[in-house]
Amino acid sequence: MAQSTTTSPDGGTTFEHLWSSLEPDSTYFDLPQSSRGNNEVVGGTDSSMDVFHLEGMTTSVMAQFNLLSSTMDQMSSRAASASPYTPEHAASVPTHSPYAQPSSTFDTMSPAPVIPSNTDYPGPHHFEVTFQQSSTAKSATWTYSPLLKKLYCQIAKTCPIQIKVSAPPPPGTAIRAMPVYKKAEHVTDIVKRCPNHELGRDFNEGQSAPASHLIRVEGNNLSQYVDDPVTGRQSVVVPYEPPQVGTEFTTILYNFMCNSSCVGGMNRRPILIIITLETRDGQVLGRRSFEGRICACPGRDRKADEDHYREQQALNESSAKNGAASKRAFKQSPPAVPALGPGVKKRRHGDEDTYYLQVRGRENFEILMKLKESLELMELVPQPLVDSYRQQQQLLQRPSHLQPPSYGPVLSPMNKVHGGVNKLPSVNQLVGQPPPHSSAATPNLGPVGSGMLNNHGHAVPANSEMTSSHGTQSMVSGSHCTPPPPYHADPSLVSFLTGLGCPNCIEYFTSQGLQSIYHLQNLTIEDLGALKIPEQYRMTIWRGLQDLKQGHDYGAAAQQLLRSSNAAAISIGGSGELQRQRVMEAVHFRVRHTITIPNRGGPGAGPDEWADFGFDLPDCKARKQPIKEEFTEAEIH
């Protein structure tokens, strides 16, 4: 290095200043010498300058350029040693931030993905995002639903979000908040404010945040609003601050600057807020996401959404229980089977699903229609009535120790001989009266015999009223049996007593052969006492019978039936015990039967000769007129 001998007074100071400003490892090259000499005076002022020759001119220009390039590379590596985009750090950094900005102007591709991930990732520091306890009052400016993982807040209102980590993250860690659309058909769109709020003066004057950003940070001057140059995603980044003493959360105040219902913006499309914990070099240490809704009344909308969610859960549970029954093979029918007509309606209460069944054949269709109508009507029947019906069926199916009722004694061999041509049972068999001189009648009476046996063992007829009443009406009806008029909707004795609150008294009536309420119409309180009904139930049953008789208007034929039925059903003997008799429920009946009359001593026989037959004297005999006798001489002898 050569130095001139002549220097100005300020030359040394200037040189020292320039020399100290140079970096110690910089390399300098000399420029070509100008045509002027070193000692040439300019403008009449004597000046001199020092020239440094660090390289000789003999070195080629290409070699000097290569040396300059290597020197610049070393300088850039020291200036940005922490950049995640250098080859030295590419292998050491496992995960980069999807929202990190390019570190070099030569990068043409953005590292941020087109569709950011919204999967929760606690990471090594157990990153968590929580909210304070909030209410659903209509006056609340924000509220969070843990059930739905959804934040409800008003526009431009402060919403505190708590950040928690289990261990301190590395220095320089930042927290990023980015909005994305929730549904797949909208996820590629960028979430921005609507033009009305973006261009308006409200909430925009005096703000450092860009007008198009939806999310803002309040009370933090270190926040940065980022617009990805390739994907266009907008986000806001704030440095991570450790929690203060005595707390375990770091609170960040966010503002949402547009309503979810704004046209031109979100337009009622649901959004997700993605909160990520990132290092300085862009590595994601944790990720959390939740749904956001910006509305006018957060408390009301939260309550409505939670109620709807619970209803859907109940329906899903009900469908899951009935899922096995709905998955059947008969859902798929052959294509040749015609479809059901418009009259078929498949609707079930409490079930949203509708199923259609195709059936071949009209008869099968009608059977299934009856089943369908029965099931639909079953849903309309009150549960207490169903329980009463089931109790009645259990009582009817209970085995009884009593002998089953019979329609009279079995025909004796003598009756078979004399009545071999008959097809129908005799009058005596229908009314339960034993035939004369029949020793087999007494043991065959059973619990529903035709008469009662007194203490002496003689038969006492108890159905004289019924015989006389039907004797005058035997030729009125043209059929064997005319059905009675509709008395009551449910004539069952079990239903009647259950409705009165006396189900314990059923056995007292059924043990005596009383199975219908029409058998009890003319009972008195004394009769109920004879049936050994408990005293606390007697008055209730008697009043129920009185109300039943007053509420129904029976015809004359029905009244005759009731009188005859009760007369034949209840008879109190000398011992006070009640015996069961045979009851026939019929309004009119006519029996055609040919009987054999033995010889009674000629035409002079009186009416006393007919007393042993057990029925009234025929009109023809009372008028002394001969009756038709249908028998052969061989039968007489």
UniProtKB/Swiss-Prot annotation:
Pfam families xrefs: P53 (PF00870), P53_tetramer (PF07710), SAM_2 (PF07647)
Glycyl lysine isopeptide (Lys-Gly) (interchain with G-Cter in SUMO) cross-link, chain position(s): 628
One GO term describing the cellular component: nucleus
Entry's localization field: Nucleus; Cytoplasm
Binding-site residues for Zn(2+), renumbered to this chain: 194, 197, 258, 262
SAM domain location: 485-551
Keyword set, alphabetical order: Activator, Apoptosis, Cell cycle, Cytoplasm, DNA-binding, Isopeptide bond, Metal-binding, Nucleus, Phosphoprotein, Transcription, Transcription regulation, Tumor suppressor, Ubl conjugation, Zinc
Top-rank taxon: Eukaryota
GO terms under biological process: apoptotic process; positive regulation of transcription by RNA polymerase II; protein tetramerization
Basic and acidic residues composition-biased segments: 301-311
Post-translational modification: Isoform Alpha (but not isoform Beta) is sumoylated on Lys-628, which potentiates proteasomal degradation but does not affect transcriptional activity.
UniProt-annotated stretches for the region Interaction with HIPK2: 345-380
Coiled coil spans: none
One Gene Ontology term of the molecular function aspect: RNA polymerase II cis-regulatory region sequence-specific DNA binding
Residue span of region Oligomerization: 345-386
Motif PPxY motif location, chain numbering: 483-487
The record's free-text note on cofactor binding: Binds 1 zinc ion per subunit.
Sequence position, cross-link Glycyl lysine isopeptide (Lys-Gly) (interchain with G-Cter in SUMO2): 628
UniProt-annotated stretches for the region Disordered: 78-104, 301-351
Family of the protein in this entry: Belongs to the p53 family.
Quaternary assembly: Found in a complex with p53/TP53 and CABLES1. The C-terminal oligomerization domain binds to the ABL1 tyrosine kinase SH3 domain. Interacts with HECW2. Isoforms Alpha and Beta interact with HIPK2. Isoform Alpha interacts with RANBP9. Interacts with WWOX. Isoform Beta interacts homotypically and with p53, whereas isoform Alpha does not. Interacts (via SAM domain) with FBXO45 (via B30.2/SPRY domain). Interacts with YAP1 (phosphorylated form). Interacts with HCK (via SH3 domain); this inhibits TP73 activity and degradation.
Function: Participates in the apoptotic response to DNA damage. May be a tumor suppressor protein. Is an activator of FOXJ1 expression, essential for the positive regulation of lung ciliated cell differentiation.
Domain commentary: Possesses an acidic transactivation domain, a central DNA binding domain and a C-terminal oligomerization domain that binds to the ABL1 tyrosine kinase SH3 domain. The PPxY motif mediates interaction with WWOX.
More info: Activated and stabilized by interaction with RANBP9.
The name this protein goes by in its record: Tumor protein p73
Organism: Chlorocebus aethiops
Name of the encoding gene: TP73
